[in-house]
């Protein structure tokens, strides 16, 4: 059997990283981590509180520390769902590229808005115009997600199980390709 590396999911808010991550970790028999939950557990506080007290920069520093800690301690043995802004720091992009098979779960701005419309735990969306915020974030982050991604999977209008199966199939194809190419 082919041993898969760490599988790290990146993408915007509402792409389904946590839901899909749980499903594929169960199928692959790997440990699952939600990076935001790890950060909250380490800080003893929730993300909105961290943003309020330390600002986005303080949160991003915690995010880098948590990411590095997970990939170093469980090399080849986990599925990790990241926060939407993981790609904003070059250091994080380097860690992602060097330590994992990175899956970009693509979601359009319209889909992101639909999926996040009822959420109160997304500090960056606590604005008068969430659509404009999501559009701006997408324009900045989409090229960065693509830069670190090994695989890109579209999630718009798809059921989580369907997306998870698509991710698993793409991972299998990718790993077979890696083995046959020498």
Swiss-Prot record:
Its EC number is 2.7.1.71. Binds 1 Mg(2+) ion per subunit. The keyword Transferase applies. Keywords: Amino-acid biosynthesis, Aromatic amino acid biosynthesis, ATP-binding, Cytoplasm, Kinase, Magnesium, Metal-binding, Nucleotide-binding, Transferase. Transmembrane segments: none annotated. GO terms for biological process: amino acid biosynthetic process; aromatic amino acid family biosynthetic process; chorismate biosynthetic process. It comes from the Bacteria. It catalyses: shikimate + ATP = 3-phosphoshikimate + ADP + H(+). ATP binds at residues 14-19, 122. It comes from Marinomonas sp. (strain MWYL1). This is Shikimate kinase. Pathway: Metabolic intermediate biosynthesis; chorismate biosynthesis; chorismate from D-erythrose 4-phosphate and phosphoenolpyruvate: step 5/7. Mg(2+) binds at residue 18. PANTHER family: SHIKIMATE KINASE (PTHR21087), SHIKIMATE KINASE 1, CHLOROPLASTIC (PTHR21087:SF16). GO terms for molecular function: ATP binding; magnesium ion binding; shikimate kinase activity. The keyword Zinc does not apply. Its cofactor is Mg(2+). Monomer. It is found in: Cytoplasm. Catalyzes the specific phosphorylation of the 3-hydroxyl group of shikimic acid using ATP as a cosubstrate. Belongs to the shikimate kinase family. Pfam families: SKI (PF01202). GO terms for cellular component: cytosol. Substrate binds at residues 36, 60, 84, 141. InterPro entries: P-loop_NTPase, Shikimate/glucono_kinase, Shikimate_kinase/TSH1, Shikimate_kinase_CS. It is an enzyme of class 2 (transferase).
